[in-house]
Regions:
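Surface-exposed cleft-lining segments at the edges of enzyme active sites
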Residues: 25-29, 67-68, 96-97
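Nucleic-acid nuclease catalytic cores
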Residues: 82, 93-140
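Short, flexible active-site-adjacent loop segments at beta-strand->alpha-helix junctions, enriched
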Residues: 20-21, 85, 127
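Interdomain/boundary linker segments immediately adjacent to catalytic/signaling cores
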Residues: 1-45
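Active-site metal-binding core of divalent-cation-utilizing nuclease and nuclease-like domains
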Residues: 31-35, 45, 52-87
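Amphipathic coiled-coil/heptad-repeat helices and related helical stalk/stem segments
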Residues: 39, 72, 105-108
Length: 140
């Protein structure tokens, strides 16, 4: 019976780890569902505001040079839309990251501005129903 206590601890640890892994999976699945619903709301909002969706899940490429060696990297955007003769690349966000105050969002939008040949970048806040046209100017 000396083995019973360590075995019980082992089973308890295993159950705790399994519970935590299941919780992470459920949280990620919930985030994916929220993202899909937000994307659908954002696409409807863009259409309602007069934008025509040309493509969804757009892929662009950028060359990065490190010490003279070239590397090509893919850049993924949520949509490419047109309004009149102007084309825009679109990033759709939900929650707190839907603001340019969020550093990751700002960097992502700047990457789009450098990668895609469009008239501008649109940030769509799916939760608030807001479309913002984003522009950049270097100050230093």
């Amino acid at each position: 019976m000396a083995w019973a206590a360590p075995a019980a601890v082992g089973v308890g640890v295993w159950l705790g780890l399994a519970w935590a892994a299941g919780r992470r999976r459920r949280r990620m699945a919930r985030a994916r569902r929220r993202g899909r619903r937000g994307e659908e709301r954002a696409i409807r909002l863009l259409r309602d505001r007069g934008y025509r969706v040309i493509a969804r899940q757009v892929t662009g490429s950028v060359e990065v040079f490190v010490d003279g060696r070239r590397g090509t990297h893919a850049v993924y955007a949520d949509a490419l839309v047109r309004r009149g003769w102007r084309r825009y690349i679109v990033e759709i966000k939900t929650g707190a990251s839907a603001s340019v105050a969020h550093r990751g969002t700002r960097r992502q939008l700047l990457e789009y501005a450098c990668t895609f040949r469009c008239c501008g970048v649109l940030l769509v806040d799916a939760d608030r129903g807001r479309i913002s046209r984003i522009g950049f100017r270097v100050l230093s």
